[in-house]
C-alpha cells in the first residue's frame, strides 16, 4: 500500500489547462477577494479583544503574526505561480510529500474554512441584530439564540449563509461583483474609522502601560490575532478561475498582505490611542470607541458597513472550501459527483452541500473552541507550504516559476519557526479536536479515498 504516492507537476498543469471552471478573475479581483477574506471579523471583533490583552503593544502582536503570514504568503506566491491549481496547499503537498499527507491537510482545511465561515456568520448575526435594534427593530432573542440556550437557533446566520451560497451557485462573475461591492463597503468603514478616530487620539494612552502583560501578553495576542490574517491563502484556491494565474496570483497575494497589515496596525493605533486599552475587550470595539467620543452617527455607519463587509468574509471562506473540496474530489479522493458542474460552470451539488453544512453549524452549534480549529489548520498548512517551497527548491530547481521567494531557504525556515512558536500556545482542547477531525478524515481515506484515487 503506497499512501505516499505523488502527483506529477505535468499532470496538474494539464488539469489546469483543461479547465471545467470559467476563468474570469484578474489581479484586482483577487486582491479584493483576499481583502474580503482577511478584513472581516478579525478587524471588526478581534482588534478590541487583542488590545485588551496586550495593551498598545498589540501593534507588535499584529506585526509578529503578520510577519509569519507575510513570509508564508511569499511561499504561497511562488508555489501558486508554479502550480496554478485550485487545490492550493493540498496540491502542493500532493506533489512534494505524498497523497496521504496532502489529503489529511486538505481534509483539515475544508473543516477550517467551513468553521471560519460559520464563525464569521455568527459575528454578522450579532452586528445585524445590533443594527436593527438601533433602528428600533427588535428581533426576538430566541431567533438568534442556540437551542442549547433555549432558542430556536441563529436564524439570521442561517439565512445569510444560504443567501451567499445562492450567489456562489450563480458563478464567479456574479459572486465577483457582489464580493467587490461588499469589500468596498468594508474598506470604506475602516478608512472612515481611522480618519475620524485619529483626531481623538491621546498619545498618553500609548505611553502609559505600553505592554501591561509583557512579552507573553504580546505573544498571546499574536496567537489570537492570527485568525485575523486567515484568508490570504484562499486567493490561491481561485487559480483555475484566474486569467494569467502565474502573474496574477503572486501579485495579488503580496498586495493583499501589505494592505491588510497596514490597515490592522493603523486601526490598533487609533483604538489604543483614543481609549485606554483595558476598556477595549468588547466585540464591537470600533463602534464602541466612536460612541465614546460622541460620534454616534459614524458608529452607526460603521455597524452598517460591518453587516455588509462581513458577508464578503463568509463568501470568501465558503468559496475556498468549495474549491479545495472540488480538487480533492477530482483526484478521486472524495465522491466524483462533487465535481459535476452546472450551466454556470459551478459544482452545484458541492456548493449547496458545503453551504448547507456551514448554515447548520452557524445556526445550531456553539462553535466556541471549534473555531480555533481554523487557526491550527491554517498554521500547520502555512508551515507545510513553507516547507514545500524548500522541497521544490531542492527537487525542481529548473522548473518555470512566475515568482521566486527571496533569500531561499532562509525565509521559509524563519516562517516555519514563527509558526511553531504560534502553535506552542494552542490549548489542549483545540489539539484534541484537531486530532479527532484528522482521525475521521483518515478513516474516510482508507475506507474510500485510497482505492478510488486516480493515482494507481
What are these regions (language model features)?
Residues 125, 152-200, 212-215, 253, ...:
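Membrane-interface loop-to-helix entry segments
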Residues 94, 121-152, 189, 241-246, ...:
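Helix-loop-helix connectors at the membrane interface of multi-pass transporters/channels
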Residues 91-92, 98, 129-134, 221, ...:
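TM-loop-TM module centered on a large, flexible mid-protein loop between adjacent transmembrane helices
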Residues 16-21, 58-59, 63, 135-157, ...:
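Helix-loop-helix junctions that connect adjacent transmembrane segments
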Amino acid at each position: 500500500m503506497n499512501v505516499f504516492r505523488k502527483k506529477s507537476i505535468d499532470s496538474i498543469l494539464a488539469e489546469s489547462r483543461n479547465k471545467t471552471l470559467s476563468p474570469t478573475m484578474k489581479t484586482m479581483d483577487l486582491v479584493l477577494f483576499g481583502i474580503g477574506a482577511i478584513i472581516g471579523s478579525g478587524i471588526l471583533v478581534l482588534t478590541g479583544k487583542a488590545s485588551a490583552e496586550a495593551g498598545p503593544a498589540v501593534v507588535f502582536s499584529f506585526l509578529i503574526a503578520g510577519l509569519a503570514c507575510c513570509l508564508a504568503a511569499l511561499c504561497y506566491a511562488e508555489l501558486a505561480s508554479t502550480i496554478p491549481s485550485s487545490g492550493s496547499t493540498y496540491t502542493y503537498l500532493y506533489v512534494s510529500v505524498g497523497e496521504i499527507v496532502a489529503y489529511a491537510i486538505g481534509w483539515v482545511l475544508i473543516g477550517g474554512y467551513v468553521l471560519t465561515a460559520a464563525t464569521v456568520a455568527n459575528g454578522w448575526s450579532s452586528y445585524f441584530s445590533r443594527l436593527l435594534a438601533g433602528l428600533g427593530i427588535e428581533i426576538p432573542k430566541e431567533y438568534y439564540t442556540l437551542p442549547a440556550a433555549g432558542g430556536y437557533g441563529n436564524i439570521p446566520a442561517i439565512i445569510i449563509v444560504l443567501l451567499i451560497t445562492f450567489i456562489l451557485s450563480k458563478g464567479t462573475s456574479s459572486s465577483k461583483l457582489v464580493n467587490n461591492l461588499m469589500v468596498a463597503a468594508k474598506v470604506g468603514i475602516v478608512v472612515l474609522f481611522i480618519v475620524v478616530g485619529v483626531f481623538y487620539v491621546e498619545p498618553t494612552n500609548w505611553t502609559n502601560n505600553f505592554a501591561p502583560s509583557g512579552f507573553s501578553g504580546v505573544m498571546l495576542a499574536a496567537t489570537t490575532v492570527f485568525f485575523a490574517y486567515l484568508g490570504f491563502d484562499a486567493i490561491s484556491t481561485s487559480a483555475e478561475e484566474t486569467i494569467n494565474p502565474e502573474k496574477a496570483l503572486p501579485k495579488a497575494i503580496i498586495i493583499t498582505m501589505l494592505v491588510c497589515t497596514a490597515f490592522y496596525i493603523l486601526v490598533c493605533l487609533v483604538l489604543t490611542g483614543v481609549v485606554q486599552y483595558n476598556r477595549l475587550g468588547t466585540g464591537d470595539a470600533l463602534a464602541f470607541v466612536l460612541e465614546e467620543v460622541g460620534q454616534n452617527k459614524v458608529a452607526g455607519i460603521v455597524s452598517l458597513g460591518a453587516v455588509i463587509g462581513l458577508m464578503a468574509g463568509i463568501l470568501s471562506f465558503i468559496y475556498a472550501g468549495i474549491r479545495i473540496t472540488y480538487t480533492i474530489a477530482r483526484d478521486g479522493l472524495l465522491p466524483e459527483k462533487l465535481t459535476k458542474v452546472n450551466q454556470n460552470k459551478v459544482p452545484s451539488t458541492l456548493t449547496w452541500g458545503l453551504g448547507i453544512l456551514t448554515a447548520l453549524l452557524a445556526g445550531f452549534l456553539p462553535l466556541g473552541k471549534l473555531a480555533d480549529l481554523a487557526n491550527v489548520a491554517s498554521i500547520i498548512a502555512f508551515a507545510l507550504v513553507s516547507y514545500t517551497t524548500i522541497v521544490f527548491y531542492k527537487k525542481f530547481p529548473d522548473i518555470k516559476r512566475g515568482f521566486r521567494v527571496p533569500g531561499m531557504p532562509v525565509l521559509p525556515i524563519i516562517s516555519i519557526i514563527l509558526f511553531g512558536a504560534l502553535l506552542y500556545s494552542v490549548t489542549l482542547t483545540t489539539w484534541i479536536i484537531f486530532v479527532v477531525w484528522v482521525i475521521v478524515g483518515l478513516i474516510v481515506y482508507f475506507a474510500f479515498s485510497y482505492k478510488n484515487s486516480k493515482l494507481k
